[in-house]
Amino acid sequence: MKDKSIKVLEFNKIQEILKNYTCTKAGKDIIEDLKPYDSVYEVREHLEETKEAFKLLITKGAPPFEGVYDIRNGIYLAEKGSALLPGQLLKIAAVLRCARRFREYINHKEQEESYRVLENICEGIFSLPKIEEEIFNAIEGEDEIADRASSTLYNIRRSLKEKNYSVRDKINSLVRSYSSYLQENIYTVRRDRYVLPVKAEHKGAVPGLVHDQSSTGATLFIEPMSLVNLNNEIKELMLKEKAEIERILTVLSAKINANITGVKTDANIVWELDFIFAKAKFASEYNCTCPTINDEGIVDIIEGRHPLIDRREVVPISVKLGEEFTSLMITGPNTGGKTVTLKTVGLIHLMAMSGLMIPARENSVISYFNNVFADIGDEQSIEQSLSTFSSHMKNIVEIMDKADENSLVLFDELGAGTDPTEGAALAISILENLRKRGAKIIATTHYSELKAYALRKEGVENASVEFDVETLRPTYRLLIGIPGKSNAFEISKRLGLPDYIIDFARENISNENIRFEELIQNLQEKSIKAQEDARLAENLKLERDKEKKKYEEKLEGLQKVRDNALIDARREAKNIIKEAKEEADKILKDIRQLERMGYSSDARRKLEEERKKLKDKLDSIEEKEIKTVHKGEALKNVKEGDEVLLASINQKVIVLSKPDNKGDVLVQAGIMKITANIKDLRAAKGSNFNSNSSKTKKSKKLNLNLRKVESSVDLRGMDAEEAIYTVDKYLDEAYLGGLGEVTIVHGKGTGVLRKTIMDMLKGHPHVKRYRLGEYGEGGTGVTVVEIK
């Protein structure tokens, strides 16, 4: 990308604005080096990171940048093995804390939107909470080490405090004793030693060491001899304190050095995030959107705004290029906004290719170009010198040397500054050459010859900036498909030029030119009307979309309320089922106890009565849940091989048998074969619950049909293979039926069948534990199994 074009399009001013949104000098340095990226992939990734940061600002508020510093100097010193100052260590700890908090800020919960690019960046954070904690624990301020930094420091400072109390008590006593010899009845400190301000003429009255004198010489600061030892002890303690502080700082600095890779990585990530969120804050402030990026030369800027023009005054422009036409000729009067249009298109492209969201409407399309060339200068003056033409031509020669099919070329007043006939011919030749190379071109011009060139040349389109003749002011709106009109006669008339002069001027223009100008005016009026109608239609569409979105959000909210209600209902049903299961287990244990005591007949009757009560209760829960959750009608007929939805466990199953006279069918759910009733089956195709099946599969679902699962299975008379198949099927049904404990009757016999069954139970997924029956349960002829 040419630096000259970047400068001409004023991208550096965007960089300066961006810097205002950063928190660190390092972030500003990243922005200082910001330029368009080298590939469409990089552009898309950096735009995505900006969009993600923009969404985070909206959904989670400001990122945790509190206390973020530029710690590059501290890192450099630590890497060299130097001991850092307390303030430098504090700043490093603050950056480490910011990195850790940022990881928490970025990480999303399951129901939240994920942020792929930012999460990948934050994956690189080392997170060093131990070092962070040690520094904050040891250092309280820029020059203040906490007492808790070490037990040695704590003891030294406690001793210092005690010694200072002793010295102050003694020196206060001396102040009272020597008050007549002192300038003031106070004590002071010189060079960390307690002294008295003695009048010079009484220096012999206070025996001690002179440490200082006043500027006039009238006062001597004398350390009384009785305080020398105490002051010495205080000085020694202060030296020990200093040495301990240096040791603490050295140890902490060494820990930074030992983890320098992690510290540097975390700091660099924080600074990168500072830069990314600066882009997001800019986008929020300037009402920017994320464009679609292509590498096919297609441009569709919808209501783009120049970000450097006052937002209250800027007029949005819409520009298309690259599909129906690859060159756009913009004509119209001076000060009409032609140059601003060029700069807007160029600057928006530079912003997008640098990973910045653009000041334009949603669904804008930007093409990735290897180069954006801009020949834009101050061409608004009346007189244009040869030197100006030469300067532009030198720039154009350079563009002609480098432009190709992956280039966007912007020309302002191409061919101006020389003879109009020669200038127009030269401009057409330049444009045609670039067009044949495949370059995308937008050019402004005054020349009528270029209007005609655009009209007759395929792939080239005219455009103009709208001018309001009534107010004599441009509206700055871009009209694509309509060549510009000079409006010289209309402007002159409104400014007061006599009609006879204007009429005489018209006579000197050919009828063909007059008809052409009238045609342009007619087209402009129709285009303006069409654009007003289009804007009205667009506003109506936006209003409709807004209302649609509002109702969709309201519907989504109602659906969430419904889903939450269903979850609560299912939770309540599970609790009831759990209580019922526990009650059934208790009854089974009571019955076995009664059987041991010889009350088998009554016990069995009681069991059946209680099981019937449970069945009725659970069936009512099942029916209620199915009616609540599943709106689809139950299937009336199924055949072997059909894939259907088993509503009670919300899972697709395969039908293995035809319904019996009770409506029960055998189905396969994964590796398990279970019995279900046809009333519990729904059509799998188009089911509203298919999308949720992956979520519900993970949680254990209970088959509520207790009436189908007996509390025991009898294997007597079966061979080993048949018994294993029967027990495996039975345990599946017992597990889904929610039974806590079951009995397998295998008989005593030779013990072969018992051993076969026990070997099988050892690794069975549904078995928690098992044992041989006790007296009254069937002894060694049965195995009692506890289900998970």
From Swiss-Prot:
Pfam families: MSSS, MutS_V, Smr. GO terms for biological process: mismatch repair; negative regulation of DNA recombination; rescue of stalled ribosome. Residues 713-788 form the Smr domain. It comes from the Bacteria. The keyword Lipoprotein does not apply. Belongs to the DNA mismatch repair MutS family. MutS2 subfamily. PANTHER family: OS10G0509000 PROTEIN, OS10G0509000 PROTEIN-RELATED. Homodimer. Binds to stalled ribosomes, contacting rRNA. This is Endonuclease MutS2. The lineage of its organism: Bacteria, Bacillati, Bacillota, Clostridia, Eubacteriales. The gene is mutS2.
